[in-house]
C-alpha cells in the first residue's frame, strides 16, 4: 500500500504592518518570477518531524538589491545548504539559479496510518524586503519535480505552486511600525 504525498510550494514573504509614507504606499512592488524543480525527497522521519529535500530554484528579477543569493530564506528549514549557484546580471534582469539541500521541519498527520496522506510545504522569503517592495510570481511552465524519482512506499500525487503573503504578528522591534493586527 502506497502512501500519498502532496507537495505544496509557497512563495511567501513577510509583511510588516507599518506607517509608511504616502510615497512608499504609492510605490509599485517589483515582480520576482520564481520556479522550482525537486530532484529528491528522502529521509522522512515521523519521530523527528522532518525530511530532506534537494531542489533547484531559479529567480528572475530587476532590482539587484534583492540579492537572493544572500537574502533567500526557507522559513520551515532546519538547515539550508547551497551546493551550487550561478547568477547572470549581464542584462536588465538578474537570472539566478541555485541548488539547495534542506532539512525541513513539518507536522505529520498520521492518525490514518498506513493510509495517510502528507502535505510537504516549502516556503521562500526575502529576508530584507517585504510585500511593499517585491511580489513573487510563480513559473508554472513544465514539471516541478522529476517524475522518475520515487520514494519507496510513497506516491507523489501532485505538486502545487502558490504565492501569498505571510503576515507577521510582530514589528521586529521597529517603533515606526503600527501594532500588528
What are the functions of these language-model segments?
Residues 4-5, 21-24:
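Terminal, compositionally biased non-globular sequences in eukaryotic proteins
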Residues 23-181:
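Soluble non-transmembrane domains of integral membrane proteins
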Residues 1-9:
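Bacterial N-terminal signal peptides that target proteins for export
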Residues 2, 16-18:
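Generic signature of intrinsically disordered, low-complexity, basic-rich segments
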Residues 8-16:
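Bacterial N-terminal signal peptides
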Amino acid at each position: 500500500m502506497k502512501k500519498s504525498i502532496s507537495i505544496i510550494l509557497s512563495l511567501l514573504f513577510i509583511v510588516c504592518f507599518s506607517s509608511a509614507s504616502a510615497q512608499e504606499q504609492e510605490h509599485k512592488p517589483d515582480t520576482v518570477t520564481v520556479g522550482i524543480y525537486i530532484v529528491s525527497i528522502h529521509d522522512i522521519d515521523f519521530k523527528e518531524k522532518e525530511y530532506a529535500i534537494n531542489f533547484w530554484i531559479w529567480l528572475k528579477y530587476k532590482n539587484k538589491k534583492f540579492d537572493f543569493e544572500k537574502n533567500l530564506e526557507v522559513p520551515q528549514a532546519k538547515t539550508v545548504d547551497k551546493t551550487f549557484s550561478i547568477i547572470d546580471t549581464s542584462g536588465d534582469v538578474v537570472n539566478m539559479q541555485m541548488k539547495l539541500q534542506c532539512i525541513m521541519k513539518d507536522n505529520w498527520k498520521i492518525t490514518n496510518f498506513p493510509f495517510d496522506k502528507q502535505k510537504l510545504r516549502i516556503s521562500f522569503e526575502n529576508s530584507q524586503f517585504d510585500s511593499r517592495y517585491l511580489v513573487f510570481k510563480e513559473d508554472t511552465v513544465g514539471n516541478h519535480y522529476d517524475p522518475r524519482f520515487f520514494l519507496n512506499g510513497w506516491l507523489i500525487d501532485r505538486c502545487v505552486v502558490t504565492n501569498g503573503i505571510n503576515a507577521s504578528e510582530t514589528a521586529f522591534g521597529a517603533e515606526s511600525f503600527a501594532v500588528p493586527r
